[in-house]
């Protein structure tokens, strides 16, 4: 009698040893087709374990080490709510870019997230940031989710494609960027300026790659000291039928408004 094949047989030996156990601060799980495939292609990620179903394995780049697993095996590796589409990977954290990379006003549009902690929102914002050509997303080191799990699933691969910077003090970082010549616009419902007008500037020429957009959490908005660090507070014009937008939607609108100025100034779209 022929013994049936073990469908969970490891295809390579590369992942049989882990430098650190799963769940440590320098590693985490991601899932979903786009998130995992983008991580596999990202040289800044170390893939410590890669589990895929037989059908999902067809989408992997040739010679990618992986473990062939049944869907229920992958289910047990992940949180109960994870929709993995046959892909799951334990990966290293992406090393943040240095803060100096976003100070220079010629380096491109910067998006600052002030204590936005919801992983779905952060993931969706990263997706919009990739779509609209953001140079880097700045987050507070202890008040932002790590780039694993739901963040990466919601970002649909964009977490691997947008640079991110972690800082201790958001307000001080904004002031440092302004000192170097950047212009910082904070988004607030009570902002004194319309967003489009704020981005256009007083001479209607825009601020080009030196623009900084600052978003706050839905519950508290931008904190007082961060508000004070901005050049101006701006609002997205809305009817009185709703009080506010989801922060990821507000970020997408804001980034679209900023992106419209790049072709006008001869910058790469």
Predicted feature residues:
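N-terminal positively charged helical leader segments and presequences
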Residues: 1-101, 269
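Active-site/ligand-binding-proximal alpha/beta "capping" segment
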Residues: 185-242, 246
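Short amphipathic alpha-helix with an adjacent loop that forms part of the alpha/beta core around
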Residues: 99-105, 176-178, 195-207
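Short, ordered loop/turn segments at secondary-structure junctions
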Residues: 55-56, 71-73, 142-144, 189-190, ...
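RNA substrate-binding interface of SAM-dependent RNA methyltransferases
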Residues: 105-193
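Short acidic active-site motifs
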Residues: 98, 169-173, 194-197, 222
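Structured adenosyl-cofactor binding patch, chiefly the S-adenosyl-L-methionine
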Residues: 37, 131, 153-158, 224-269
């Amino acid at each position: 009698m022929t013994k049936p094949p073990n469908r969970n047989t490891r295809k390579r030996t590369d992942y049989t040893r882990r430098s650190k156990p799963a769940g440590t601060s320098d590693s985490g799980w991601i899932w979903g087709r786009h998130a995992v495939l983008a991580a596999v292609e990202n040289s800044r990620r170390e893939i410590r374990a890669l589990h895929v179903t037989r059908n999902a394995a067809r989408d992997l780049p040739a010679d990618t080490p992986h473990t062939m697993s049944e869907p229920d095996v992958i289910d047990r590796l992940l949180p109960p709510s994870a929709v993995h589409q046959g892909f799951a990977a334990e990966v290293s954290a992406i090393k943040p870019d240095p803060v100096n990379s976003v100070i220079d006003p010629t380096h491109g549009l910067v998006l600052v997230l002030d204590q936005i902690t919801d992983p779905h929102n952060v993931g969706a914002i990263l997706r919009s940031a990739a779509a609209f050509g953001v140079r880097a997303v700045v987050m507070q080191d202890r008040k932002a989710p790590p780039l694993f799990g739901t963040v990466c699933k919601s970002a649909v691969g964009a977490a691997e494609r947008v640079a991110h910077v972690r800082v201790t003090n958001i307000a001080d970082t904004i002031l440092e960027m302004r000192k170097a010549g950047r212009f910082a616009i904070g988004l607030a419902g009570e902002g004194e300026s319309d967003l489009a007008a704020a981005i256009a500037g007083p001479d209607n020429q825009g601020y080009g790659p030196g623009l900084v957009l600052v978003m706050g959490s839905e519950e508290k908005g931008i904190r007082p000291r961060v508000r004070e660090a901005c050049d101006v507070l701006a609002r997205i014009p809305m009817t009185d039928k709703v009080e506010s937008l989801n922060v990821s939607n507000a970020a997408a609108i804001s980034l679209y408004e900023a992106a419209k100025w790049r072709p006008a100034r001869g910058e790469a779209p």
